[in-house]
Amino acid sequence: MFTRVSSFVDTVWSGITKPSDDDYNIVTTPTAGRSSSRAGKDFAVSLALFQALCLLFFALKFNMPSPKNNDVDTKSTLSYYGMYMDVHVMIYIGFGFLMTFLRKYSMSAVSLNFLIAVLSLQWGIITVTMSHQIMGNHHTTKILDIPTMINGDFAAGAVLISFGAVLGKATPTQLVWMTFFEIIFYSINEYIVLEELKATDAGGSMVIHTFGAFFGLAVTIALGVPSSDEQVHNTSRYDSDVFAMIGTLFLWMYWPSFNSALVNEDGFQKERAIMTTVFSIAASCASAFAATKVLSYSKKFDMVHLQNATLAGGVASGTCCNLAISPAAAITVGLVVGIASVVGYTFVTPRLEMIMRMSDTCGILNLHAMPGLVGGLAGALITFTASDDYYGDSLTDVYAARAYRSVTAQGWYQLLAIVSSMGIGSVSGLIVGLFLRSSWFRQHKHKYDDKEWFHMPEVCEV
């Protein structure tokens, strides 16, 4: 069966792909042509299989809401739509443009971000729903709603964070398979953290950012460090940095919606989540500007720091955004992670690249891993110290397990959630990374360069 599919794809591919040597400014040999054709076929088959699997699951296990199968008030789910679209903007525009900083990889960055997001959205809805049904031992048709769609975008966020670590080094085919496997492990960790440990993590500091970052870092370690010759295009230029800053601004504006999208309105939780995120991300922006001026080697503003460290407060406030936190505490969290992120970009990442042979293209260690850990720790600290009276009747809505757990026990479970996200992310990322490095996959020949996979209408040497 697979041979017939492959033969059909070969026939179609040979008819529609005849690359011109002029488009690439390189000499094409028969071997190179066959290699390119095979790479294109592998990608098309992988993508077709992935989408077909999603179609099969949606046909068998999901249905649209109707008066016959759903008695939930329509207004109660449509109230999530505004937040859903804000999260959508972050996933497709924010993340997409944030990754366009590489001077010769902007087309790939924004386009592959688009592809990964749409695959993750579908597969995330399926796997998160299935993990809850399998573990909960209730196998029924899932009636879709807007919160479920938001969970799909959250899953996409985790994969796009990992994408940042391998940006420019993994082929589109490898990225399709990375997405497929990562979403499965993401769903397992999400179920463990939220359902087994009963930890609270409204904005995903642990489930999304910590997991996605450690998964991506493990994958990039497994793939190895590009040679000095391959690193030649791992740089930015004036216009690519400006485009990346557009992504930063979209992410910065909509992060309060991301953190509060699924927060319940009872007990002023959603209001707290929005305001905590605003204060924290504003503070991280201010401290990042100050830190880059002081710590950068040229004593000037570094666009890498401004594009990324300014967002660290949004990541760090994810777990604690709807908890008993004051404005001053939220600002303190933002100030700390803004400075720490700049320190990471300036001093930590270069040393880790030498010691651990880790090539982190977007610096997700400093934007997602470290702030995610700080956010998880902040959530645990608040859990240990906050009074139950603060939450009133909404206590068990914030902490589902507090109906039978002490405050101390809940704090320890919050810490276990951090360990789970780090551990599952690291181990699964290493396994998937070794799989992607195997002989089953063609490796990226022209790293950080669009020309290997994209038609280049006009080639400019910059």
Predicted regions and their residues:
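Hydrophobic alpha-helical transmembrane bundles of multi-pass membrane proteins
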Residues: 2-462
